[in-house]
């Protein structure tokens, strides 16, 4: 049975590095990306050319309600139940409290909080049903712990995520 890892937001940065490392450790990789199609294709090609692992990329707008859970469930159906979920997709928005908009607040809550919670719920449900003892890893930020200028929304959302994780 192949080990399957899901990494959200893996077309670049931290997520890309995590996906490459997991592939080198013997995991088949399913990852989401949003707009960096060329980078996503390059990552899949690199995984397939440097390891013997399968790689599948999914264009997912994690800002949309239900998108994260749908992605996890789709991967489970198409590749098998994951034993690792790495929640990494996110976006940093630095705005003064005077300039923030309801759209910015909604975007960051959906992407950096709700998405993480519902991806975890979907992955944990799949793992429990399949009797898989898996791992769920959530990438957060030091911005949850320290005050930064123009960071009320992003830092607040990451702090909410960190506190939620303590209670799971």
Feature-to-residue mapping (PLM):
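Active-site loop immediately N-terminal to the catalytic Tyr-X3-Lys motif
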Residues: 98, 146-152
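Active-site helix of classical SDR
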Residues: 120, 157
């Amino acid at each position: 049975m192949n080990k399957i890892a899901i990494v959200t937001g893996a077309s670049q940065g931290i997520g890309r590095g995590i996906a490459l490392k997991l592939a080198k450790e013997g995991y088949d990789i399913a990852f989401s990306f949003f707009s960096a199609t060329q980078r996503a294709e390059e990552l899949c090609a690199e995984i397939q050319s440097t390891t013997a692992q399968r790689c599948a990329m999914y264009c997912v707008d994690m800002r949309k309600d239900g998108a994260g859970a749908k992605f996890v469930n789709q991967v489970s159906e198409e590749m098998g139940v994951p034993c690792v979920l790495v929640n990494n997709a996110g976006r940093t928005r630095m705005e003064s409290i005077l300039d923030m908009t309801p759209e910015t607040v909604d975007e960051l809550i959906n992407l950096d909080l709700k998405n993480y919670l519902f991806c975890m719920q979907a992955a944990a449900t799949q793992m429990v049903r399949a009797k898989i003892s898996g791992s769920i890893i959530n990438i957060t930020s030091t911005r949850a712990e320290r005050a930064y200028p123009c960071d009320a929304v992003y830092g607040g959302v990451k702090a909410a995520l960190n506190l939620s994780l303590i209670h799971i």
